[in-house]
Amino acid sequence: MPTIKQLIRNTRQPIRNVTKSPALGGCPQRRGTCTRVYTITPKKPNSALRKVARVRLTSGFEITAYIPGIGHNSQEHSVVLVRGGRVKDLPGVRYHIVRGTLDAVGVKDRQQGRSQYGVKKPK
């Protein structure tokens, strides 16, 4: 515990909260262009080929974003919408691509949890 004299000399500094998605610049989503679409392998206990894209955002940042769902049509020069949200087993992947908007089509034949994957209600 500091003494009164120490507190007079230096006031307490407020705790600065660091944003988990700095590339979005306080916005809920940002538009970007895919520069590279590829797969990476997850951290230790898991095993898969996770689909990710390198995206150049309108804010000027170049980020790695996860492509959720089974199958995708994203390729180089695709214009995509990016939201925050990390992928726990992929180090350095702190963003998700929003399916069903711009050039990223929704997941084919999806019946449940459609909202997350940009799929309209089946007739």
Swiss-Prot record:
InterPro entries, sorted: NA-bd_OB-fold, Ribosomal_uS12, Ribosomal_uS12_bac
SUPFAM superfamilies per UniProt: Nucleic acid-binding proteins
Molecular-function GO terms, alphabetical: rRNA binding; structural constituent of ribosome
CDD domains: Ribosomal_S12
Alphabetic keyword roster: Chloroplast, Plastid, Ribonucleoprotein, Ribosomal protein, RNA-binding, rRNA-binding
Membrane-spanning residues: none
Pfam families the UniProt entry points to: Ribosom_S12_S23
Cellular localisation: Plastid, Chloroplast
One GO term of the biological process aspect: translation
Function, in words: With S4 and S5 plays an important role in translational accuracy. Located at the interface of the 30S and 50S subunits.
Classification via PANTHER family: 30S RIBOSOMAL PROTEIN S12 FAMILY MEMBER (PTHR11652)
Family classification: Belongs to the universal ribosomal protein uS12 family.
Subunit structure: Part of the 30S ribosomal subunit.
The protein's name in its UniProt record: Small ribosomal subunit protein uS12cz
Taxonomic source organism: Populus trichocarpa (Western balsam poplar)
Taxon lineage: Eukaryota, Viridiplantae, Streptophyta, Embryophyta, Tracheophyta
